[in-house]
C-alpha cells in the first residue's frame, strides 16, 4: 500500500506552490520512479507549459527518457534543479515535438557522461541556452540535436568536448550555428 500524505500536509504543499508562484518540493526526490510520478502530477497540473523549479534530484544518476514522447508540452522550465550526481541524460526530451522552450539553467552537469539524443526530434524548439554546462566528462552527444529543425539560436559557449568520443549526427537536420569538425564542436 502506498503512503498517502495527511490532508493538512497535502494542502500545505499546494499553498506553498500557490504563494510562491512556482513548484517547490521541500525534500529531495530519492528515486527515478518518485521523480516520474512527481513530473506526471505537475504536467497534469500545469498542462502544456510546465514550471518545476529548484527540484533536488541529487540522489538520482539516470534521467533517461524522463520527458520523452510528451507531444503535449510546449514549454518547460526546470531551472535550478540540483543535478550534481546525474550521469546519464540520454533521450531525456526525445521526441517532444511541440516543445518550443526549455529552461535548464543552473544545472550541474559535471558528472554527466551521456547526452545522446537529449533533444532528439524537438522539431519546434527555437532557442536553447546551455552555456555554462560542464561537459568535461561527457563521452557521447550522438544525435543530441537531431531533427531540431527550428533550433536557430543555440548557445554552447564554454562546452569542453575533449572527452567526447561519439558526436555522430549531433546537428543533423538542425540549423543551429554549430557543426562537428575533427570531433570538435565549432561555430559555423
Task: Label each region the model flagged.
Residues 2-188:
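Negatively charged
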Amino acid at each position: 500500500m502506498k503512503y498517502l500524505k495527511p490532508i493538512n500536509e497535502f494542502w500545505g504543499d499546494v499553498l506553498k506552490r500557490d504563494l510562491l508562484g512556482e513548484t517547490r518540493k521541500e525534500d529531495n526526490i530519492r528515486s527515478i520512479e518518485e521523480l516520474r510520478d512527481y513530473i506526471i502530477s505537475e504536467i497534469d497540473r500545469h498542462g502544456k507549459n510546465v514550471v518545476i523549479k529548484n527540484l533536488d534530484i541529487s540522489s538520482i544518476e539516470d534521467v533517461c527518457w524522463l520527458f520523452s514522447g510528451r507531444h503535449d508540452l510546449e514549454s518547460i522550465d526546470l531551472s535550478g534543479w540540483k543535478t550534481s550526481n546525474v550521469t546519464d541524460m540520454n533521450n531525456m526530451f526525445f521526441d517532444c515535438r511541440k516543445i518550443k522552450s526549455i529552461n535548464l539553467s543552473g544545472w550541474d552537469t559535471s558528472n554527466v557522461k551521456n547526452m545522446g539524443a537529449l533533444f532528439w526530434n524537438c522539431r519546434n524548439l527555437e532557442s536553447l541556452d546551455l552555456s555554462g554546462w560542464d561537459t568535461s566528462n561527457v563521452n557521447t552527444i550522438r544525435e543530441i540535436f537531431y531533427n531540431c529543425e527550428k533550433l536557430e539560436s543555440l548557445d554552447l559557449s564554454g562546452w569542453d568536448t575533449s572527452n567526447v568520443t561519439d558526436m555522430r549526427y549531433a546537428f543533423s537536420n538542425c540549423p543551429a550555428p554549430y557543426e562537428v569538425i575533427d570531433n570538435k564542436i565549432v561555430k559555423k
